[in-house]
């Protein structure tokens, strides 16, 4: 991650790698090996690149990020499909409150979260029932206590534009716990 900073706008260039850490040889109850797209891992090394931009304004901040994952061939001659994720967020930061010498700072957040997923490819054949675009509207709350931040949000699907026959996404609960070091 490379970060450019000034008082008005913060920009970060993101780069990373998704490592093949998940199992690729799981079997069903009858002993048959699961298809590659049903395995916990893909068995591929996938580079990720992206960009994040943030701009504070008074008690608010406006944030955007996007990243692209280039999927490589993994187990069972399968390519899980490239993906592109993108997020837009607005945060309203309330004034902090002191509680027993600890600074509590609540924030309200509203986000648009999107992901596009390419079709899975098995032995050079595309699976028409994989991939597509999904966009969520996600209102949420962040509670910061000194260097610890807890995030909670609900994602309501705005767009379920999947390829082929796939179940639609429902409401998602997102949580995170962050410690600033």
Short names for language-model regions:
Residues 1-81, 144:
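Outer-membrane pore/translocation modules
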Residues 77-181:
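Outer membrane beta-barrel transmembrane domains
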